[in-house]
Amino acid sequence: MYKVIIIDDEKAAIETLRRDLEVQADLEIKGTAGNGAKGKKLIMDIHPDLLFLDIELPDIQGIRLLSEIREQVLWDMKVVFYTAYDKYLLQALRESA
């Protein structure tokens, strides 16, 4: 079973993604957060296998959050960035998302 965390400030986006992911038998949503500070704590507490991360959060950009925790994440965590803004694509790719 893969542990999943969703970090997004839009509750509707979290619920849509949760609904889509819950039909996958090998994925378990372990937590959600609406900002980077709560998301960072969830990541460090839960050690997810898969992180869905919105690029635009109220307190920090998702790319910046990933950059800040990179040294602390010592497990294999896959990151899926998503956003409505294509201007962040290259920066996200540079962060290995």
Residue ranges: model-predicted function:
Residues 7-8, 33, 51:
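Conserved sequence signature across two-component system core domains
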Residues 2, 11-31:
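Two-component/phosphorelay signaling modules centered on CheY-like receiver
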Residues 7, 13-14, 58:
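Extended hydrophobic secondary-structure segments
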Residues 5-6, 81:
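Short hydrophobic beta-strand elements that form part
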